[in-house]
Amino acid sequence: MEMFLMENNNTSFFHQPIRVVSPLSLVLILFTTLFFMSHGEKANAIDLSVISNQTGLMFKLAYIPLTQGAVASSKATKKAQDLIFRDLVESGYFDVSIPSNEAVSKLQAISLTGEGTSMLASGGYEGVAAARVTEDGTGTHVLGVVRDPVSGKVLLSREYTTSGAARHAIHRFVDDVIFQFTGLKGIAMAKIAFIGKNPRRGYDLYAMDFDGEGLHRLTFDHVLAYSPAWSLKTHQIAYVSYLHMDPQILVYDLRTGRRTALARFPGLNITPDFSRDGIHLAVALSKGNRSQRTEIYVTTLKDKTFNRLTFSRSNNLSPSWSPSGNQIAFVSDRDGHPQIFVMDSDGTNVHRITYNGFYNVSPAWGPSGDLVAFVCMNDRHRPKICLTTPDGSRSIQITHGRGQDDSPDWSPDGRSIIYSHQVRGKSVIMKMFLDGSHTHRIGTFPRDVITPMWAIP
């Protein structure tokens, strides 16, 4: 959840994608009164063909769901085969299809490592993936193979075993298929944290797999919470909680389930963000009562010494680290309205990068370093997701249509973005490729969700 404070007759206004009320009865509202108007020199649009080239790397892949004996009638095995197909499609790297029934029947009758895939070469396939899923008393076993349809050469042959959910073995196989074709790490094993509304009252911290499965509730506080920041290197999630009435930054340890307070100064302690190395966190603190402005600080989990980076007479919040750790994007109203700025990680070389409109917040720096996602206000005064280059020279709006879009965050491979989407009071997590294609909901969480965040690998 992007929060933005502006002093106006001693009242603080917050941008918030859904209606909630804190224990202290703070008024939380959207900046719907801010118009999306031209302000200063407009940036040039980002070339969509460039974005498409980033996300449009496609390989034509045949998938063969291999069966063996009674396994063919297993509902669990059929579900596992469907998940493999879905994971391959979801990756965005493959144009996946299951060949004709005749071809499948012939290929199912041969050994995984035998000859026979050449019958698919005429179909223009660049690879043939096959998997056999079996279950026994020790767990689920996935034997996955990828072959060249022309030469018949085995490109990948590996068995994946798990004593837990079958999807874990399947996700590992799909990530290996992606690496075999692209040389890039897949995201099938990636995790997403978010804040979810509880059935009766309040919110809590949740985590799930990249596809919305494997949902886990991590906290049971029933209080307002938001802005999770997840570092896999430290196995920790930093987030904002009103557990002790005031907004404090807590750190949840995924290994132990324990929480510690990172920042609990008087006033606001909000919007944490981990650096890629998992060592540093950038946060926004007011260090006083709620009428005080927030400033950006950097700290570490080890010594908890807070180094102040911003010193302007304005609100500064929502820091987002660059992949290199050398720069930080953040929100400031120093020019009168909330805009995105970038500074070096020591607080120097501050410069503004958004100029279109009066409302640009919630920056999220992409893992490749060449794009920053953020929330902009469209011409119908609805928050939408936009992209800009780090120097502000090019920008584009990538979500459209009804509803309000908020809290963008990047997949670890930089090919897609998740965000919260609200229509008619209902907020869900959506995912899309950068070119706007393959937009769909993630998960089936039955209540409102806010501030989704990918785990930083």
What would you call each of these model-derived segments?
Residues 43-59, 150-219:
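C-terminal/domain-edge helix-coil "capping" segments
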Residues 47, 109-176:
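Amphipathic beta-strand/beta-sheet edge segments enriched in Tyr/Trp
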Residues 67, 72-85, 89-140:
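Short, solvent-exposed, polar/charged sequence segments at loop or secondary-structure edges
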Residues 104, 209-226, 253-270, 299-317, ...:
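Multi-bladed beta-propeller domains
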Residues 185, 196-204, 222, 240-249, ...:
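A flexible loop/linker signature enriched in serine peptidases of the S9 family
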Residues 187-188, 232-233, 276-277, 323-324, ...:
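Residue-level detector of Asp-centered blade-edge/turn motifs that repeat once per structural unit
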Residues 192, 237-238, 278-281, 325-329, ...:
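Hydrophobic beta-strand positions that form the internal "hydrophobic ladder"
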